[in-house]
Amino acid sequence: MISAQACGANGKMKDYHYSGPVEHKFSPYAFNGGTVLAVAGEDFALVASDTRLSEGYSIHSRDSPKCYKLTDTTVIGCSGFHGDCLTLTKIIEARLKMYKHSNNKSMTSGAIAAMLSTILYGRRFFPYYVYNIIGGLDEEGRGAVYSFDPVGSYQRDTYKAGGSASAMLQPLLDNQIGFKNMENVEQVPLSQEKAVQLVKDVFISAAERDVYTGDALKICIITKEGIREEIVPLRKD
């Protein structure tokens, strides 16, 4: 029998319109903005990031640096989804503790980069939404920068920018450090003082144009003596 609910007032069947399949979407990722940058010199390396944590037009935190100290000679900068940044850095720190207990020494910057590549590649079907840059000293005491994509491909660079303002910072670094497509220019070694000032200048410029970058700049200066930090205020609007 046909129920009364399926019939109209005149006793005829109601017309039903099929609108097509409905796709229920679930996104496990969010983009929390922020910018990271690393520069390598002859005997030093810099890793810098802003401290703004945002989503869309909302600022969740004004004091959330994206630089994480791994060893006495290695710092990692992470930008992207903040939850994945925290999870990934905790995994790296646990691996470093296991390595130190087993080998009675700290892992080198190059070994950390290789380990991170395997961690990211192992999650390639559900990747961490994180852009990573490692800065530190290599076995010979020279500055080294390693940049990654979200699924583990990496390379060693002299300088690299990542995050929401990377498209603004990378051309400036190409010009001021890499001397790309410049003729009759003397390429002098980059001093630590000039590198720090350059990092401050490019972040101040980026904060003027990128709404996801701002509040403050944290610079980690890595030398054989250890890691020194500097905080520089940026615009807060």
Curated annotation (Swiss-Prot):
One record GO biological process: proteolysis involved in protein catabolic process
Keywords attached to this entry:
Cytoplasm, Nucleus, Proteasome
Broad class of the protein's primary localization: cytoplasm
| Localisation per UniProt entry | Cytoplasm; Nucleus
Question: Which pairs of Cys residues are joined through disulfide bonds in the record?
Answer: none
Q: Which GO terms describe its cellular component?
A: cytoplasm; nucleus; proteasome core complex; proteasome core complex, beta-subunit complex
UniProt cross-references to PROSITE patterns, sorted A to Z: PROTEASOME_BETA_1, PROTEASOME_BETA_2
Q: Gene3D superfamilies this protein is in?
A: Glutamine Phosphoribosylpyrophosphate, subunit 1, domain 1
Pfam families given in the database record: Proteasome (PF00227)
InterPro entries, from UniProt?
Ntn_hydrolases_N, Proteasome_bsu_CS, Proteasome_sua/b, Proteasome_suB-type
Per its database record, what is this protein's job?
Non-catalytic component of the proteasome, a multicatalytic proteinase complex which is characterized by its ability to cleave peptides with Arg, Phe, Tyr, Leu, and Glu adjacent to the leaving group at neutral or slightly basic pH. The proteasome has an ATP-dependent proteolytic activity.
Protein family = Belongs to the peptidase T1B family.
Subunit details = The 26S proteasome consists of a 20S proteasome core and two 19S regulatory subunits. The 20S proteasome core is composed of 28 subunits that are arranged in four stacked rings, resulting in a barrel-shaped structure. The two end rings are each formed by seven alpha subunits, and the two central rings are each formed by seven beta subunits. The catalytic chamber with the active sites is on the inside of the barrel.
State the name under which the record lists this protein.
Proteasome subunit beta type-1-B
